[in-house]
Amino acid sequence: MNAGSEIVEKWIEKVAESHPQSAAALRAPQPDPFRNPIGYTIRNGLAQLWEQLQGDMDPDAIDSALDNILRIRAVQDMPGSEAASFVIPLRAILSQASGTFDLDLLDNRIDRLAQAAWGKYKQCRDQIGAARLHETARLARTHRLIRKAGA
């Protein structure tokens, strides 16, 4: 296992520790996208984020990976600060890693990634709120039509 894969595996473990409800899904060695979509999505998202942290920090690739991870975390029962904080443990993992990483550069990029994660989480929660509001309005209209038809 190379240093990058080792870091991603440790990061996955930290995410699993932070949210026990997802732990089994994340700890599956080779998650199947059909049998274990949560584990598969989060594992792939973290691997993509790690690639971007080491690479050119492509905003579209980062947004896509964060979107996949945070859509899951936005519907789980956890506070927003916890849902978006999965980026932070990467600092400790890197400080203990046996690899040649530019820690100052990665530290700055982790900060940017954490900010982007919070923004994406808020966007996902806003979408959930809008969907709930739309569904409530639809049910109210349906209820009025049923009452009107029965009257």
Label for each model-derived stretch:
Residues 78-97:
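Elongated alpha-helical scaffolds
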